[in-house]
Amino acid sequence: MDPCECSKTGTCNCGTSCKCSNCQCACCKKSCCSCCPSGCSKCASGCVCKGDTCDSKCCQ
């Protein structure tokens, strides 16, 4: 299963609340980690955004 197409197309839409453009997430979930910013993609346990932006705070 490949929930993100960022690595292939540069854009992706993971679910209804995760939209990516040029591998930047407007909001990210665990299933969309591959296109989160560097601060999120480093999280081994996945990334979860509690707000409307995807930044280092979404790493848990």
UniProtKB/Swiss-Prot annotation:
<feature type="binding site">
    <location>
        <position position="32"/>
    </location>
    <ligand>
        <name>a divalent metal cation 4</name>
    </ligand>
</feature>
<feature type="binding site">
    <location>
        <position position="36"/>
    </location>
    <ligand>
        <name>a divalent metal cation 6</name>
    </ligand>
</feature>
<feature type="binding site">
    <location>
        <position position="33"/>
    </location>
    <ligand>
        <name>a divalent metal cation 5</name>
    </ligand>
</feature>
<keyword id="KW-0479">Metal-binding</keyword>
<feature type="binding site">
    <location>
        <position position="33"/>
    </location>
    <ligand>
        <name>a divalent metal cation 4</name>
    </ligand>
</feature>
<feature type="binding site">
    <location>
        <position position="14"/>
    </location>
    <ligand>
        <name>a divalent metal cation 3</name>
    </ligand>
</feature>
<feature type="binding site">
    <location>
        <position position="23"/>
    </location>
    <ligand>
        <name>a divalent metal cation 3</name>
    </ligand>
</feature>
<feature type="binding site">
    <location>
        <position position="59"/>
    </location>
    <ligand>
        <name>a divalent metal cation 6</name>
    </ligand>
</feature>
<feature type="binding site">
    <location>
        <position position="25"/>
    </location>
    <ligand>
        <name>a divalent metal cation 2</name>
    </ligand>
</feature>
<feature type="binding site">
    <location>
        <position position="35"/>
    </location>
    <ligand>
        <name>a divalent metal cation 5</name>
    </ligand>
</feature>
<feature type="binding site">
    <location>
        <position position="14"/>
    </location>
    <ligand>
        <name>a divalent metal cation 2</name>
    </ligand>
</feature>
<feature type="binding site">
    <location>
        <position position="43"/>
    </location>
    <ligand>
        <name>a divalent metal cation 6</name>
    </ligand>
</feature>
<feature type="region of interest" description="Beta">
    <location>
        <begin position="1"/>
        <end position="28"/>
    </location>
</feature>
<feature type="binding site">
    <location>
        <position position="47"/>
    </location>
    <ligand>
        <name>a divalent metal cation 4</name>
    </ligand>
</feature>
<dbReference type="InterPro" id="IPR017854">
    <property type="entry name" value="Metalthion_dom_sf"/>
</dbReference>
<feature type="binding site">
    <location>
        <position position="18"/>
    </location>
    <ligand>
        <name>a divalent metal cation 3</name>
    </ligand>
</feature>
<dbReference type="Pfam" id="PF00131">
    <property type="entry name" value="Metallothio"/>
</dbReference>
<feature type="binding site">
    <location>
        <position position="43"/>
    </location>
    <ligand>
        <name>a divalent metal cation 4</name>
    </ligand>
</feature>
<feature type="binding site">
    <location>
        <position position="4"/>
    </location>
    <ligand>
        <name>a divalent metal cation 1</name>
    </ligand>
</feature>
<feature type="binding site">
    <location>
        <position position="6"/>
    </location>
    <ligand>
        <name>a divalent metal cation 2</name>
    </ligand>
</feature>
<feature type="binding site">
    <location>
        <position position="49"/>
    </location>
    <ligand>
        <name>a divalent metal cation 5</name>
    </ligand>
</feature>
<dbReference type="InterPro" id="IPR000006">
    <property type="entry name" value="Metalthion_vert"/>
</dbReference>
<feature type="binding site">
    <location>
        <position position="20"/>
    </location>
    <ligand>
        <name>a divalent metal cation 1</name>
    </ligand>
</feature>
<feature type="binding site">
    <location>
        <position position="23"/>
    </location>
    <ligand>
        <name>a divalent metal cation 1</name>
    </ligand>
</feature>
<comment type="similarity">
    <text>Belongs to the metallothionein superfamily. Type 1 family.</text>
</comment>
<keyword id="KW-0480">Metal-thiolate cluster</keyword>
<feature type="binding site">
    <location>
        <position position="40"/>
    </location>
    <ligand>
        <name>a divalent metal cation 6</name>
    </ligand>
</feature>
<feature type="binding site">
    <location>
        <position position="12"/>
    </location>
    <ligand>
        <name>a divalent metal cation 2</name>
    </ligand>
</feature>
<feature type="binding site">
    <location>
        <position position="59"/>
    </location>
    <ligand>
        <name>a divalent metal cation 7</name>
    </ligand>
</feature>
<feature type="binding site">
    <location>
        <position position="58"/>
    </location>
    <ligand>
        <name>a divalent metal cation 7</name>
    </ligand>
</feature>
<comment type="function">
    <text>Metallothioneins have a high content of cysteine residues that bind various heavy metals.</text>
</comment>
<feature type="region of interest" description="Alpha">
    <location>
        <begin position="29"/>
        <end position="60"/>
    </location>
</feature>
<feature type="binding site">
    <location>
        <position position="49"/>
    </location>
    <ligand>
        <name>a divalent metal cation 7</name>
    </ligand>
</feature>
<feature type="binding site">
    <location>
        <position position="28"/>
    </location>
    <ligand>
        <name>a divalent metal cation 3</name>
    </ligand>
</feature>
<dbReference type="InterPro" id="IPR018064">
    <property type="entry name" value="Metalthion_vert_metal_BS"/>
</dbReference>
<feature type="binding site">
    <location>
        <position position="54"/>
    </location>
    <ligand>
        <name>a divalent metal cation 7</name>
    </ligand>
</feature>
<feature type="binding site">
    <location>
        <position position="6"/>
    </location>
    <ligand>
        <name>a divalent metal cation 1</name>
    </ligand>
</feature>
<dbReference type="GO" id="GO:0046872">
    <property type="term" value="F:metal ion binding"/>
</dbReference>
<protein>
    <recommendedName>
        <fullName>Metallothionein</fullName>
    </recommendedName>
</protein>
<feature type="binding site">
    <location>
        <position position="36"/>
    </location>
    <ligand>
        <name>a divalent metal cation 5</name>
    </ligand>
</feature>
<dbReference type="InterPro" id="IPR023587">
    <property type="entry name" value="Metalthion_dom_sf_vert"/>
</dbReference>
